[in-house]
Amino acid sequence: MSENIKQGGAGTFMQAPQDSVPLPPKDAEVMTTACDYCTVACGYKVYRWPVGKEGGMKAKDNAFNADFPHQQIFGAWASPAQHNIVNHNGRSHHVLVLPDRDTTVVNPGGNHSIRGGTLAQKCYNPSNRTSERLLYPMIRVRGTLMPVSWDLATEVMADISQYILAKYGEHAWAMKTYSYQYFENTYAITKLGMTSIGTPAFAWHDKASATNDATGLDDAGVNSFASSDQDWADCEVAFLSGVDPYETKTTLFTQWMMPGDKKFIFVTPHRTMGVAWAESTGRGMWLPIIPGTDTVLHLALARIIVENGWQDQAFIDKWVANKWEVDSGYGRGTRNTGWQWRTTWGKWQSDWKDYSAWILKQKEGELETAAKITGLRAEDIRKAAEWIAKPKADGTRVKASFMLEKGNYWTNNYMNSASLASLGLICGSGNRPGQMISRGGGHQRGGMSAGGGSGWLSPEKYPGRRKKSFNLDRWMMNGNVRFAWVIGTTWTAAMMASQALQDKMFSLTRGNPHQISSLDRKAIFETLKQRVDSGGTVIANSDIYPCVPVGTEYADIVLPAATWGEDNFTRCNSERRLRLYSKFYDAPGEAKPDWWIIAKFAQKMGYDKDGSYQWKNSNDVFEEAARFGRNGVLNYHPLVVKAKEKGVKGHELLRTYGTDGIQTPIRMKDGELVGTQRLHDPANDWDEVEGQEVKRKWLYAFGTHSGKAILLKTPWDYPGWSQFYKAALPRKEKGEVWVTNGRVNETWQSGFDDLRKPYLSQRWPYPMLIMHPDEAKPRGIESGDFVQVYNDTVYIQMGEPQGVKEDDLYFDTLMKNGHIKTTDGQFVAVAIVSEEMRPGVVMANFNYPQAPANSVVHAVPDPMTNNYRYKLGRGVLTKVGESPYKHSFTSMTLKPRDIV
């Protein structure tokens, strides 16, 4: 146990607070940026000035133009967590990273979360734990990473890559990478992987395949990020499925949703802070649902609405496709693409006449049956239906908006998201102010694909031999990957059956007898050649910190990446708002941005012979990438065109927009750039689009051939779900409970930054496990105890099953045909016993490196989407000792989170 504490950076300690912060002088440089963490991306200003110089206490002597001390709590002010000392042009400089009090969007007045309030602490400073940053390219020699030059590192990668591509083909060369860390980087990464190499073995950080998250929304014709912040302010009821925006999108909640008198319906097994606040004000309802059963709740709500005639019939008549419109635009070709065959398959395809009759026949939609399946009270389900759909006394309709996030679609991927879309549509939501259907968002929207890609080369097929995305986890587990480049992601901890994936990765890399023993380039190649020819794998890992375990244990080549603040980058937030994230300090050591690393490798591969990969700076990548986004909702191409007209760089034109930025897709009107507040809104049916852009139907209608939304049926007894769900249920005879996972407000993702920030690492030095007293007391567990979560039957889908018949990818058939194997998994966390969790469900930290909760989750994807059910773990809880936090008050509070 002590070793686990050591690895987690844990222990009881008291952070000695810094008692003063220097004021910026009048001539301090000021730059704009946005928060690096959640999808809201609050706007920030960076003040930079040389060490040895400070501003004065009088307004005339500091850059804040404010007298100090002052009593204005929301006035000019900086905390110790917002200050750091960095290098700029080789000299030490003070920096203050402060929320922009002058911005008019996203976070007006300088609102921000605790995550953004500690941004300055993520900047490299050799005097604190950011000194753990990767500083130099390294190659593992006899198990130890040794610093080398960029040339040698990329030459070694190119040597073995060329050999693998020639002998084993592009399928054997894989990329596992983030999808969000700035347009400049994701464009370069996809250009290399999808175009130059053309590998189908490509997957994003959060999925085993290059798939979409909320496929049910896509099929309905609803873009996952159609809404704006203003829509969440303007709605009268917010139906929040699998999400508490306060915990994960804090400023969206506090700035845009809390003001006024709107009502909140939270569908989540965890009574989080946002839930507690809404209930305490009389404006909220908590539906503590059993994980995975959201579809049944949606069916029950829809049935109540239809039975009472509360549907928005005028909206349905105008905006929901009839059966002929669903099929329109397909021609005579095969229904090979996922959304084509799903929306035209009778099991799901519907229109209002069919759906309204179907919903009344669903046994699971009957109120008492639904209450039993979901674990909710029947009266609460009825009350929720009234809130979202019952007309007001004067006959006007409630303005309801529907938000979903991972608690929804990562338990029952297709059916939960599709059924929510149908529920929202019959309530008249989806394309008008205050009445939207949208994801809340996790990370920011920084993906810009270079096109190409060979995902259709996947050896797997959906039933009917239809195209299916490539599952990289399964490809690795089957031993088919000879080279993998892992970029900015905790691959194993983020995926299902984490420990089984770790074991396999170890056996293919460090467990292989062929290990590098010197830094001679030819000798390295011969060694790695012998490894791949013996069935082993070579791994390169690009990251900002040593990544456990891929970078620290398995990777042969480790590359140091530059990140936020260390180069000029761009991306959008959840309302598609594009901003420049300004460079304001030097990257440490020899760390380079990922676009630069990609270009360096591509040149070693010879992919630059046609003039490609010759970028001199990040702006070059930004401008090249612009034309590849013209068909999408993140289109910023008009901005680049406008910049060229003005004779300035695209980055520099965007810089003039400051923290307000501009919402994509961008268009031209009267020669000026204009943003798009929301998608699908008929008010967007502008006149002829100026310049080089083409009017896209999804701007002013839904994203279907007809422009009308598709109403989808979601039968609870669909075998592709019901067979798996039956197998995944906690087994009472073993004393198992549901094991889900989630985020808490204070930390972000895997804690890559937060574990190195003094205050936050004191607050969360070790992963927690929140459980109800009903689970804790019989097991002798108290808050502060170390608890092991163990699942002795974790299912893993193996092989590349071919879908010919309809049931070929159903769980029972996969099991019968030998495509399901079982393993076990466990992790240890610190118990927090609280009634904030519903009985029968425990919640662990999302993606904590030393305690991968996904180890107890099944690696069997949804047969409709090829996505995992990330939050449907199960396990036995066992007390294994007391943590040092149980009797200490210096770190890791064990108090409930639902205190208001």
From Swiss-Prot:
<protein>
    <recommendedName>
        <fullName>Iodate reductase subunit IdrA</fullName>
        <ecNumber>1.-.-.-</ecNumber>
    </recommendedName>
</protein>
<dbReference type="GO" id="GO:0003954">
    <property type="term" value="F:NADH dehydrogenase activity"/>
</dbReference>
<keyword id="KW-0003">3Fe-4S</keyword>
<feature type="site" description="Involved in charge transfer">
    <location>
        <position position="113"/>
    </location>
</feature>
<comment type="function">
    <text>Involved in iodate respiration. May accept electrons from cytochrome c551, and catalyze the reduction of iodate (IO(3)(-)) to produce the chemically unstable intermediate hypoiodous acid (HIO). This intermediate then undergoes abiotic disproportionation to yield two molecules of iodide (I(-)) and one molecule of iodate. The resultant iodate subsequently cycles back into the reductive pathway. The initial reduction of iodate may inadvertently produce low levels of incidental toxic H(2)O(2), which is detoxified by IdrP1 and IdrP2.</text>
</comment>
<dbReference type="Pfam" id="PF00384">
    <property type="entry name" value="Molybdopterin"/>
</dbReference>
<dbReference type="GO" id="GO:0022904">
    <property type="term" value="P:respiratory electron transport chain"/>
</dbReference>
<dbReference type="InterPro" id="IPR006657">
    <property type="entry name" value="MoPterin_dinucl-bd_dom"/>
</dbReference>
<feature type="binding site">
    <location>
        <position position="35"/>
    </location>
    <ligand>
        <name>[3Fe-4S] cluster</name>
    </ligand>
</feature>
<dbReference type="InterPro" id="IPR006656">
    <property type="entry name" value="Mopterin_OxRdtase"/>
</dbReference>
<dbReference type="InterPro" id="IPR041632">
    <property type="entry name" value="AioA/IdrA_3Fe-4S"/>
</dbReference>
<dbReference type="Pfam" id="PF18465">
    <property type="entry name" value="Rieske_3"/>
</dbReference>
<dbReference type="GO" id="GO:0051538">
    <property type="term" value="F:3 iron, 4 sulfur cluster binding"/>
</dbReference>
<dbReference type="GO" id="GO:0016020">
    <property type="term" value="C:membrane"/>
</dbReference>
<dbReference type="GO" id="GO:0043546">
    <property type="term" value="F:molybdopterin cofactor binding"/>
</dbReference>
<keyword id="KW-0560">Oxidoreductase</keyword>
<dbReference type="Pfam" id="PF01568">
    <property type="entry name" value="Molydop_binding"/>
</dbReference>
<feature type="region of interest" description="Disordered">
    <location>
        <begin position="1"/>
        <end position="21"/>
    </location>
</feature>
<feature type="binding site">
    <location>
        <position position="38"/>
    </location>
    <ligand>
        <name>[3Fe-4S] cluster</name>
    </ligand>
</feature>
<keyword id="KW-0574">Periplasm</keyword>
<dbReference type="GO" id="GO:0042597">
    <property type="term" value="C:periplasmic space"/>
</dbReference>
<dbReference type="InterPro" id="IPR009010">
    <property type="entry name" value="Asp_de-COase-like_dom_sf"/>
</dbReference>
<dbReference type="GO" id="GO:0046872">
    <property type="term" value="F:metal ion binding"/>
</dbReference>
<keyword id="KW-0500">Molybdenum</keyword>
<dbReference type="GO" id="GO:1990204">
    <property type="term" value="C:oxidoreductase complex"/>
</dbReference>
<feature type="binding site">
    <location>
        <position position="42"/>
    </location>
    <ligand>
        <name>[3Fe-4S] cluster</name>
    </ligand>
</feature>
<comment type="similarity">
    <text>Belongs to the prokaryotic molybdopterin-containing oxidoreductase family.</text>
</comment>
<comment type="subunit">
    <text>The iodate reductase (Idr) complex is composed of a molybdopterin-dependent iodate reductase (IdrA and IdrB subunits) and two associated peroxidases (IdrP1 and IdrP2).</text>
</comment>
<dbReference type="InterPro" id="IPR050123">
    <property type="entry name" value="Prok_molybdopt-oxidoreductase"/>
</dbReference>
<keyword id="KW-0408">Iron</keyword>
<dbReference type="InterPro" id="IPR014066">
    <property type="entry name" value="AioA/IdrA_lsu"/>
</dbReference>
<keyword id="KW-0411">Iron-sulfur</keyword>
<keyword id="KW-0479">Metal-binding</keyword>
